Amino acid sequence: MLSRKLSPEQLVARRLKIRDWNHKIGAVVAPHYSPTLSIRNPAPPSQLSLPLLLSSGAHLGHSTSIWNPYTQPFIYGKREGIHIISLDQTMVYLRRAISVVRSIAKENGIILFIGTRNGQKDSVVAAAKRARGYHIFDRWLPGLLTNAREVQGKLGGSILCKDNRGKLIQTDKKPSYVFPDLMVILNPLENKSACLEAQKTHVPTIGIIDTDADPRMVTYPIPANDDSLRCTDLIAGLLSRVAEQEYQKANQAFEKDKFTLPL
């Protein structure tokens, strides 16, 4: 009997029956997918494969009616009115983005992760912590790069330091600002102003480009499905894991080469 002919109660009963039968022979039916696994423990770059991208839905594009012609090299074909993204192209561009992140992290660069769609907050925050960078999950403030001093003045803020007794006190120094060395944007269509400001200030960007987006918006496009949280979580996790590995290598090299001064 096919599963679609069973009622929800029958499906639950069948699963419980299979579980009880498997316990008798020492087997356990483990879940195949955990929604938060790619956020808590993302796959390292060595495990990047076509089946991994396929399972995340990275190949699913948008309707052919809203197709952007500049994404033609990324498209494999059409099926039921939507474009199918070539995962071979996704693999090539994703590996290039991984190399870019690796080079930035190797030089202790600042990486900014941006994801402002619903559901992207957890992956953006986790990726920023893993890469020792920063994150934006609410909205991009216009002028954050091109008019940083004015935006900083409107936002306010002050520099705190500790006195001799360890108490925090406010200083007269004005907070300074530093541009990021790389911006990873999970949804470039909703953050066009961020892409334009990055171009004007010569900040390189990595962005997930769906079939309805313009790959020229970012410096290093990654053709993939930007509507799938599983896909965006996977890409953000891969890129942040690369940066984490580079920082771990630097710490290991420091521990190996450090020395003690003679008394």
Curated annotation (Swiss-Prot):
Component of the mitochondrial ribosome (mitoribosome), a dedicated translation machinery responsible for the synthesis of mitochondrial genome-encoded proteins, including at least some of the essential transmembrane subunits of the mitochondrial respiratory chain. The mitoribosomes are attached to the mitochondrial inner membrane and translation products are cotranslationally integrated into the membrane. The gene is mrp4. This is Small ribosomal subunit protein uS2m. It comes from Schizosaccharomyces pombe (strain 972 / ATCC 24843) (Fission yeast). It is found in: Mitochondrion. CDD domains: RPS2. Its main location: mitochondrion. The keyword Transit peptide applies. One of its GO terms (molecular function) is structural constituent of ribosome. Belongs to the universal ribosomal protein uS2 family. It comes from the Eukaryota. Component of the mitochondrial small ribosomal subunit (mt-SSU). Mature yeast 74S mitochondrial ribosomes consist of a small (37S) and a large (54S) subunit. The 37S small subunit contains a 15S ribosomal RNA (15S mt-rRNA) and at least 32 different proteins. The 54S large subunit contains a 21S rRNA (21S mt-rRNA) and at least 45 different proteins. One of its GO terms (cellular component) is mitochondrial small ribosomal subunit. The keyword Ribonucleoprotein applies. The lineage of its organism: Eukaryota, Fungi, Dikarya, Ascomycota, Taphrinomycotina. Pfam families: Ribosomal_S2. Residues 1-15 form a transit peptide. Keywords: Mitochondrion, Ribonucleoprotein, Ribosomal protein, Transit peptide. One of its GO terms (biological process) is mitochondrial translation.
